[in-house]
Amino acid sequence: MRSITAIVCLLIAGATTVQAQQNPYDVALIPKDLLSYSSAVVRDKEVSIDVKDLENTVYHIKEVVTILNKNGDNMAHIVVNHDKNISIKNIKGIVYNSFGIQTSKFSESNFEDINTTDGFSLFEDVKIKRYTPEVTDYPYTIEYEYEQRIKGSLIFPDWRPNAETGVSVEKSSYTFICNPDFNIRYKEINIPTTVNITTDKNGLKTYTWQLSNLKAVKYEPFSPNPENYLSIVKIAPEKFSYYGIDGSFTNWNELGKWEYDNLIANRQELSDETINRVKEMTGGINDPKLKAKKIYEYMQGRTHYVSVQVGIGGYQPFLASDVDKLNYGDCKALVNYTQSLLKAVDIESYYCVVEGNQRKISLLADFSSMNQGNHIILCLPFKNDTTWCDCTSQTIPFGYLGSFTDDRNVLACTPNGGKLLHTPKYSTQNNLQHRSANFNIDEQGELTGDMITNFTGVNYTDREGIIHESPSERVKIMQEIYRINNMNIEKLEFKQDKSLQPVTTESIKIKAPEFASVDNGKIYFLLNPVNRILVTPKIIYNRATDVYINEGIIEEDEISYTLPAGYHLENKPEHRNIERPFGKYIATMKIEGNQLIYNRKFELINGTYSKDTYQDLVDFYQSVVDADSHNVILAKNN
């Protein structure tokens, strides 16, 4: 009996020892509810910001994240910026396998050190160190930490515990430490807890946010901006020093004033020669808007965009006189230069900070901070006709913004302070793609004919990338766009009307042998070969987010087929009319003599809709897919 008892005790002791020795980053230890919808799990993340004084801040991060599959790989990419005012200390890390067993180590020597070249970034003088673990066996875990020492106290990174959809969080914390006389403002967005503020005996203040067991938010098609439902804390100082420049702000007016006075003013001087040239060039134009258009096109014709590493932390534009001499600049420099040219003929304009993104991300009206916005555009406040310009493109029309910067709050930096303005919205009716096609089909099934398509509103730039390609590459791309069987392009032209209501026109002449199938005296072909919706949104059960349509559009197609003599339409003409709160679809066909005439209209209406309408949206798209797949059967007359 004693021996049996001893064995049992040994087994229990052994099991306890194995459990105690289990590696802390073993994937098996992740709570099961954190695996649902997850591609990555943040096991532990500690972010601390220690403001020593106005001119010295220490930023420290330590993170352990488990990558469950390749969709989570970006969470293992480590990117750390640095420049002459930001130094990196003690950067290191470890990679573990699924059992939490170390497989490799890395240090600063393993990082690639590169210059940033993002064409729309405001941080273009910043270098980055980048590291990506070479791991192909999933799951794996990466642990890393580093410290940045920053000369200044203007910009603090947001805390985003679940940085994106598909990421769950076991534990995450954000600690902000500062002296008694250093005051901050903060904004909590979708945070289930609130800040804990403590003060030690020396008056040192500590703000702490903590989260644990945060489930992943699954990706859902047609979802709103992630900032509407992911967790974020934003922090901004009241007083600060930025690379030797002191300042303070508690609202957008004060921040815009500081930016104008310290980063923009006194950088708009031009030579007398340039000023006289601009005055002479616009001398015969009385309308201020047309005068500004002339100047904008002059700027486009003599400059080109480059990523320039210059200025105070990437925020200060080149001198206008330098751009005038060198004929290049970044987004800041080209806006500043255009402002200077306009100023020469007494046209007022505003230097505006915007968040450039296909999603409409506005600067927060109730919370000002320097790290909102990544691009600069120009505003011309004409009376009852405010006009906006993006100065980084040498091809887009005067007054055109497009979907990258339309319909959002921006900060105008003026001598009188900052103003929150809103860029214009391109309405659904403006965003039109209208196509007219005239085709012939012969008895052998060959299709010949031509199409003309006009693009307006946000669609104006739909062919922008193609226009500047070589003729052979243009043809190749158009064959991908128009998936017509055996299509040969005999002629292809693009024209751009760059008036105040710009239009891109595409003209194409095609020939497609054996486009239609011929069998036993009948001809079969796809009614709509030029503009079909081919896929439906994924079915989502228990949807969590509202349905969001970012941009409203209208597509109109008019196709006329001349049918071969001696044939008639065998199948019944197709008519579809589908209408929902978020969209419409109308398709009709009719016979007029030897003409088969097909008309199609597809409309999406931008806006936010209840999550309960998502299945209606899926059904709507499925109905459109079915309608767009309609086949025509022509039969020979008896």
Language-model regions, residue ranges each:
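Bacterial Sec-dependent N-terminal signal peptides
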Residues: 1-24
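A sensor for short, sequence-defined functional sites
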Residues: 21-638
